[in-house]
A protein has these predicted regions:
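Phosphate-binding glycine-rich loop
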Residues: 1-15, 29-33, 39-41
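Hydrophobic residues in well-ordered beta-strands that form the structural core
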Residues: 18, 39, 91-93, 117
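Active-site region of PLP-dependent enzymes
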Residues: 98-104, 111-166
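Proline-centered loop/turn at the N-terminus of a beta-strand
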Residues: 15, 36, 63, 88-90, ...
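Aromatic/hydrophobic pocket-lining residues that form π-stacking "cages" and hydrophobic walls in ligand
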Residues: 26, 80, 144
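Conserved coil-to-alpha-helix start sites within the AMP-binding
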Residues: 21-27
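Catalytic PLP-binding core of fold-type I/II PLP enzymes
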Residues: 51-66, 72-105, 137
Length: 166
C-alpha cells in the first residue's frame, strides 16, 4: 500500500531491513515490488534482531524496516520506532506470530505505519486463511479498502482517493 500512496515513499531499488528469520510471505511481496532486502542476523537467545544491529545495517538507501516479532517475543519496537522517526524511515510490523504480545504495555502490531496479522490455521487466531492489517494512516486505510475489494471504491468515504487524484 505504501507504493500506491499519492506521494509514494518507496521506489524500486529502495532498501528494506528484514530479519534473517521469518516466513517467505514476509519477503516475497517486497521483492515483487523491486525492493532490495538487507538481511540482519538475529540473536540466538531472542530469535529477533536487536535494534542496534538494525540501526547499524541501515544505509542512505534504507526506506523501510520490517520488524518481525517471533513466537510472541517482541522486537525492540519502542527503540525502532524512535530510530525510524529520527531517520525518516518507515516501520512496518509483521505481527503474525505475536498476536496479544506487549512491548512496554503497548500491543505489538500497533507500532508501525502498517501492521500485519495472519489468521492462517497455524496461528493464534485461525480462519483457515486470511489476515488483518492495522494502520493509523487514513490514505493507506482507504487504499486497503480498495485492494480488499479488487479496486472497487464503494466502501471509501466520499470516494476519498478518487477525489484526491482528480
Amino acid at each position: 500500500s505504501l507504493f500506491f500512496k499519492k506521494k509514494s515513499p518507496l521506489k524500486r531499488g529502495d532498501e528494506v531491513i528484514v530479519p534473517s528469520i521469518s516466513w517467505s510471505t514476509s519477503y516475497f511481496p517486497l521483492i515483487q515490488y523491486g525492493l532490495k532486502l538487507r538481511f540482519v542476523d538475529v540473536d540466538k537467545n531472542t530469535i529477533n534482531c536487536s535494534a542496534d544491529n538494525i540501526n547499524r545495517a541501515c544505509t542512505k538507501k534504507t526506506k523501510l524496516i520490517l520488524a518481525v516479532s517471533i513466537l510472541g517475543n517482541p522486537v525492540e519496537l519502542k527503540k525502532l520506532k524512535s530510530f525510524c522517526k529520527q531517520k525518516k524511515i518507515y516501520l512496518m510490523e509483521d505481527n503474525c506470530e505475536s498476536t496479544g504480545a506487549k512491548h512496554y504495555n503497548q500491543f505489538t502490531g500497533t507500532f508501525g505505519i502498517v501492521n500485519t496479522f495472519s489468521t492462517f490455521y497455524s496461528h493464534h487466531i485461525s480462519t483457515i486463511e486470511g489476515g488483518v492489517i492495522l494502520t493509523n494512516d487514513y490514505e493507506i486505510y482507504n487504499l486497503m479498502l480498495s485492494l480488499r475489494s479488487h479496486g472497487w471504491t464503494r466502501d471509501m468515504k466520499d470516494n476519498f482517493y478518487l477525489k484526491k487524484n482528480q
